[in-house]
Structure formats: C-alpha cells, structure tokens
C-alpha cells in the first residue's frame, strides 16, 4: 500500500511540475506574440521580440513553438492575436497584498476567473490604487547564492558599466535590483563577466514586507496557487515574507 501511495505521490508531483512548465512556456509564447504583433517578425529589427525570443530560448522553449509564435503574432498565419494587459489588486490574509498581472484576449473571462480564484481562496478584490502603492517597478535579476557573493556581483555589474541599486540575499538566491531602464545593461554586464543567472525580469517589488503565521501562510499559498494556475495570469507579485520556521511547520502538514 505504501508503495502505491509513493507512486501516486510521485505521479502527482510530476503532473504539477509538468503543468508549471507548460504554464511557463505559455507565458513566454504570449510575450513573443505580443512583441511580434507590435514590431513585426524580424528579430534583428525588433528589440522587444529579440528579448522575448532570447528569454524563451533560455527557458528551453522549443524552437518550433517560438517560430510559430512569431508568425502568429505578426499575422502571418491568418490568426488575429490581440492581447490586453490588465492589473488586478488583491488583499490577502493578515495584511498581505498582491498584484495580479494578466495578459488576455478576453477581458471578461480574465476578470471573472481572477475574481473567482480570489474569493474562493481567502482573498478580496481591492480598488485600483489601494494596493499598488505598496510596490515599486524594478528590474530584478535572480541568480543562485551558491558560488556568488554580494561584493562580487556588484563588482561584475559596475565593471560592465551598469548600475545596480542593491544586491539582496533572498533564501538561496541573490536578487540584483535596478531601475527598470537599467535591467538589460545589468544582465549584459553579468553575461560579459561569465556570471550565470536564472532570470531577468521587470517586477513589482514591495516597499515593505509582511510576515505571516502558519495559518496566514496556508491561505496565502492557496490563493497564489489558484491565481498562478489561471491561463490569463502572467505574474503574481506580493509583499509577503514567510519565515523559515513557518515554512517548516507547513512542511509538516
């Protein structure tokens, strides 16, 4: 019986990983389609498309998928791709706040899906501006803490002629924060220094973080999981900090 249980658990974990991988691929594909629609299919003459394609390749999105997305976005397949960007503001448990970034071809569907996910999982929809003021738009490069140091990363960025506001240790990762306009120069400086990084994105970073207890963390994680599972949701940003001892308690559930 235990063997069957372990196999079922393994299958479930694989299904979760596969679903997240598919969702990540869909996110990159949408970004490619939007960039191709706005600036055409020529990567050399469309910097936004060049960046979107580069990120997709770094995430191991298959080349065939990338090529089809470029053609769809540029209108070369006869399909009409018209996405709208929408930001929803959400209040979570124990003073937590979330920004839900959507890229959708159906605003009504996106609004209904987000509202349902929020209300069913312990959150409440917030008025525009009532949550977003708690965040700042930043360039953010994530890389593993192992093998790197704060001083070494700052030196690599500065020697590459880029500007970084700060380097923050977050769990087992370093985060290099910059002005949004400096993000690509920071990433380029790291590339030139031979420093490998996991991601470089524009994100909404909280000006202050909120600590949650185990009960609040359970609700928060259920809420964010429900939102991130939605097809129209590209990103979920929050001001939450879950302490290691709280995470350890959740692991015992």
Curated annotation (Swiss-Prot):
Record's keyword terms, sorted: Cytoplasm, DNA-binding, Transcription, Transcription regulation
In terms of PANTHER family, this protein maps to: TRANSCRIPTIONAL REGULATORY PROTEIN YEBC-RELATED, TRANSLATIONAL ACTIVATOR OF CYTOCHROME C OXIDASE 1
BP term (GO), one? regulation of DNA-templated transcription
Task: Give the InterPro entries listed for this entry.
Answer: Integrase-like_N, TACO1_YebC-like_2nd/3rd_dom, TACO1_YebC_N, Transcrip_reg_TACO1-like, Transcrip_reg_TACO1-like_dom3, YebC-like
The Gene Ontology CC terms held by the record are: cytosol
Task: Name the coiled-coil region(s).
Answer: none
Protein name per Swiss-Prot or TrEMBL: Probable transcriptional regulatory protein Mlut_12910
Identify the species of origin: Micrococcus luteus (strain ATCC 4698 / DSM 20030 / JCM 1464 / CCM 169 / CCUG 5858 / IAM 1056 / NBRC 3333 / NCIMB 9278 / NCTC 2665 / VKM Ac-2230)
Subcellular location field: Cytoplasm
Which top-rank group of organisms is this from?
Bacteria
Q: Which Pfam families match?
A: TACO1_YebC_N, Transcrip_reg
